[in-house]
UniProtKB/Swiss-Prot annotation:
Keywords: 4Fe-4S, Iron, Iron-sulfur, Isoprene biosynthesis, Metal-binding, Oxidoreductase. The gene is ispG. The lineage of its organism: Bacteria, Pseudomonadati, Pseudomonadota, Betaproteobacteria, Neisseriales. It comes from the Bacteria. InterPro entries: Dihydropteroate_synth-like_sf, IspG_bac, IspG_bac-typ, NO2/SO3_Rdtase_4Fe4S_sf. This is 4-hydroxy-3-methylbut-2-en-1-yl diphosphate synthase (flavodoxin). PANTHER family: 4-HYDROXY-3-METHYLBUT-2-EN-1-YL DIPHOSPHATE SYNTHASE, 4-HYDROXY-3-METHYLBUT-2-EN-1-YL DIPHOSPHATE SYNTHASE (FERREDOXIN), CHLOROPLASTIC. HAMAP family: IspG. SUPFAM superfamilies: Nitrite and sulphite reductase 4Fe-4S domain-like. Converts 2C-methyl-D-erythritol 2,4-cyclodiphosphate (ME-2,4cPP) into 1-hydroxy-2-methyl-2-(E)-butenyl 4-diphosphate. One of its GO terms (biological process) is isopentenyl diphosphate biosynthetic process, methylerythritol 4-phosphate pathway. Binds 1 [4Fe-4S] cluster. Belongs to the IspG family. It holds the Pfam family GcpE. It comes from Neisseria gonorrhoeae (strain ATCC 700825 / FA 1090).
Length: 421
């Protein structure tokens, strides 16, 4: 695992999950169901949790939504899911919390946007009510500032001051500073209102990668609160994945960031869980956490005109993901398993030996056999039409043998009984 130095922060306890400092970076997601539909929302939270989301944010934007939050919590508890719920409040959060006190109690964290709680004295009163409600209910708060909904009175104040400055900055730099000031001033107000410092998480979201990196570097240097990372809108498909990865990987490598959410625009027909998988893969490929056994596979070249190794690599990765909901409980540590599926003799044997389990499929013109390596040693050679099912059986047996309750994986060599296939 990556041993990079994490940024030192307060630690915030959100139910059973610790956020900040040396605690693992937490994966967060958000539903896109109508929160007023308690059944559909609870089922999507279950789906996101099964995929690996450790906290889930839900929209609380209307009396109908607020009235269903406690029911959503009960439904999840009845299904055996303790996933913390984050209430996403904008514009009318104080009214909803006042009218539906059970909503505030059922949530584990409130997300408050200081840019749209209201203006002037009235806005201050609304903010104060939400903060005091969180404190009374012993709930954490994320003060989430967004570029698109920045407090305009603050922005104007800072722009006016910049105009008369002896060394004026470009307007975009003033706006970035305004994001940071909004978050820090709001956190200061929250503490004065009675919310403990170890109940506060901050975020300053923008949509451009370079801006996000700049803002969070500065924000992280000026406070000791845990930070939630994510682009406001990353986009759709590969663009969204690349943008999120480019931004978050830089910050995480510098030790900045304690919770993350990948704000992907869902493609038609794609599962909501994709944002969870992308977040996990960012953390896992950086060596920060392990969630699911990883498959190493070569990209293919002229030596691998067959698609067999590509299909097998996909089958193995899908199989491992499907099994994790069961394996996570039965076989602690299995998430660190590494499997190699290689396409020819050039790098196949070497990569397969480095993995826990590896298979080197024949390339174009090579002998149609596939040697399997277990813990660096060649154990069996597969051939014929059942290579995929036979290899998956070997993986399954390896997991049971090396990660089962009666095994001691860390204290003895990995072994697997290879039967004649």
């Amino acid at each position: 695992m990556n041993t990079l130095q994490r940024r030192k922060t307060h630690q915030v306890l959100i139910d059973h999950i610790t956020v900040g400092s040396e605690a693992p970076v937490v994966i967060q997601s958000m539903t896109n169901t109508d929160t007023a539909d308690a059944k559909a929302t609870a089922l999507q939270i279950k789906e996101l949790s099964d995929a690996g989301s450790e906290m889930v944010r839900i929209t609380v934007n209307s009396p109908e939504a607020a009235s269903k939050v406690a029911e959503i919590r009960r439904r999840l508890d009845d299904m055996g899911y303790a996933t913390p719920l984050i209430g996403d409040f904008h514009f009318n959060g104080e009214r909803l919390l006042a009218e539906f006190p059970e909503c505030g109690k059922a949530l584990s964290k409130y997300r408050i946007n200081p840019g749209n709680v209201g203006k002037g004295v009235k806005g201050d009163e609304k903010f104060a009510f939400m903060i005091r409600t969180a404190a009374e209910n012993d709930k954490a708060v994320r003060i989430g500032v967004n570029w698109g909904s920045l407090d305009q009175s603050l922005a104007k104040r800072m722009m006016d001051a910049n105009l008369v400055s002896s060394a004026p900055k470009p307007p975009e730099e003033v706006m970035k500073e305004a994001l940071i000031v909004s978050a820090l001033e709001s956190a200061e107000k929250a503490v004065l209102l009675g919310l403990p410092e170890d109940k506060i998480i901050l975020s300053c979201k923008v949509s451009a990668v370079h801006d996000l990196i700049q803002v969070y570097r500065e924000l992280g240097s000026r406070c000791v609160y845990p930070l939630h990372l994510g682009l406001t809108e990353a986009g759709m498909g590969s663009k969204g994945i690349v943008a999120s990865t480019a931004a978050l990987s830089v910050l995480l490598q510098e030790g900045i960031g304690d919770t993350i959410r990948i704000s992907l625009t869902p493609e038609p027909g794609s599962p909501r869980t994709q944002e969870v998988v992308v977040g996990q893969e960012i953390l896992q490929t950086m060596g920060l956490r392990s969630f699911t056994p990883m498959v190493t596979a070569c990209p293919g070249c002229g030596r691998t005109t067959s698609t067999v190794f590509q299909e097998l690599a996909q089958d193995v990765q899908n199989y491992l993901r499907q099994k994790m909901s069961i394996w996570r409980t039965l076989y602690p540590g299995v998430e660190s398993l590494n499997v190699a599926v290689m396409g020819c003799v050039v790098n196949g044997p070497g990569e397969s030996k480095l993995a826990d389990i590896g298979i080197s499929l024949p390339g174009t013109g090579e002998t149609p056999v596939a040697p399997v390596y277990v813990d660096g040693e060649r154990k069996v050679t597969l051939k014929g039409n059942n290579i995929a099912s036979e290899f998956l059986a070997i993986v399954e047996e390896y997991v049971k043998t090396n990660y089962g309750k009666n095994s001691s994986k860390r204290n003895k060599g990995k072994v697997i009984p290879i039967q004649s296939l």
